[in-house]
UniProtKB/Swiss-Prot annotation:
It is a single-pass type III membrane protein. Homopentamer. Interacts with membrane protein M in the budding compartment of the host cell, which is located between endoplasmic reticulum and the Golgi complex. Interacts with Nucleoprotein. The keyword Glycosyltransferase does not apply. The chain crosses the membrane at residues 17-37. Plays a central role in virus morphogenesis and assembly. Acts as a viroporin and self-assembles in host membranes forming pentameric protein-lipid pores that allow ion transport. Also plays a role in the induction of apoptosis. Residues 1-16 are virion surface. GO terms for biological process: disruption of cellular anatomical structure in another organism; viral budding from Golgi membrane. Belongs to the betacoronaviruses E protein family. This is Envelope small membrane protein. PROSITE patterns: COV_E. It is found in: Host Golgi apparatus membrane. The keyword Transmembrane helix applies.
Amino acid sequence: MLPFVQEQIGAFIVNFFILSVVCAVTLVVCLAILTAIRLCVQCVSGCHTLVFLPAVHIYNTGRAAYVKFQESHPPYPPEDWV
């Protein structure tokens, strides 16, 4: 085999190896980013379920009780009592 053919084959093998490593690193970085995004979505969902929904329920219950209290006044005494 001629020497320049061996150099071309060697260069091809090295380039293929470098390309494979770059693809693997890119794949790992993309997976890490997607995993981090998924973790953030799960944290936000948990926060929504554990913090905001009970707070909204308590707020709505308190508001309903306040409105009910405001609408149900005891009757005024007759005017001849004054």
